[in-house]
A protein has these predicted regions:
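Ser/Thr/Pro/Gly-rich low-complexity linker/stalk segments immediately outside membranes or between
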Residues: 24-38
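Extracytoplasmic segments of membrane-associated envelope/inner-membrane machinery
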Residues: 100-181, 187-188
Length: 235
């Protein structure tokens, strides 16, 4: 029995020593971080080089670091300051290289007066120096409280091939929202930013039924303000 207890004790000491030594080797291992540590090959608004240089400027990473000095939380927190990025995840990969996964926000509407975009959540995205996304444009003054609503309108338009190809831009007279089609002279009076999907669906059904008729060609304004109604005002 004593021999068995002694054997277990020796084994436990060896195991603990091995774990301590392994951990010591890990935290004192050099890791090399470069632009290839950043994972995302489909960026459109910012480059991996820009992200890498931003992290270096913020002292979140260096070209070579001890594992002990790598602060994964700091990397993720600094990346939150890049408004092009929606999510980041920093972790150790196989054999301990640092992996920095990032995902990009997707603009759905361009706010012309303010010179920025909104994504589908209503988050502000700065203009990019490397790309100009083709999204619906909005002209007019916008209350920041309506960012989510106008972003929802933009997202609904950009998610539908008919709306995306049919509408030219959105504008506001500070009271109501209007939409201008690409191929027609009339204006769509959208009204307030409510019942967005329902209003657009009503318009799509109306257009499908009337696109070949004179009522479309003779229209000056198409009113979507009222529930389940499409009212045509002729020239």
């Amino acid at each position: 029995m004593k021999m068995k207890i002694l054997t277990i004790s020796v084994f436990s000491i060896l195991l603990l020593s091995s774990m301590i030594f392994s951990n010591y080797k890990h935290v004192n291992r050099s890791v090399y971080i470069n632009v290839n540590s950043i994972v995302n090959d489909s960026l459109t608004l910012i480059t991996k080089d820009s992200v890498f240089n931003f992290l270096k400027k913020k002292n979140a990473i260096k070209d070579s670091m001890l594992t002990l000095d790598v602060d994964l939380n700091k990397i993720e927190n600094e990346l939150k300051n890049i408004d092009y990025l929606k999510m980041s995840n920093a972790f150790y990969g196989i054999n301990s290289p640092v992996v920095i996964q990032i995902s990009e926000r997707s603009p759905v509407i361009e706010i012309k007066n303010e010179n920025f975009y909104l994504d589908n959540e209503g988050i502000i995205i700065s203009k990019s120096k490397i790309n100009s996304p083709k999204v619906i444009a909005f002209f007019g003054n916008l209350d920041s409280l309506n960012n989510k609503k106008i972003a929802r309108l933009g997202n609904t338009i950009m998610s539908d091939d008919f709306f995306k190809n049919h509408f030219n831009y959105v504008f506001s007279d500070s009271l109501e929202i209007y939409i201008k089609p690409k191929l027609y002279d009339y204006v769509i009076e959208f009204g307030l930013l409510d019942n967005i999907e329902s209003k657009l669906t009503n318009y799509k059904l109306f257009y499908a039924a009337k696109s070949e008729s004179n009522s479309i060609k003779e229209a000056e304004k198409i009113n979507l303000k009222f529930t389940n109604q499409v009212i045509v005002q002729k020239k």
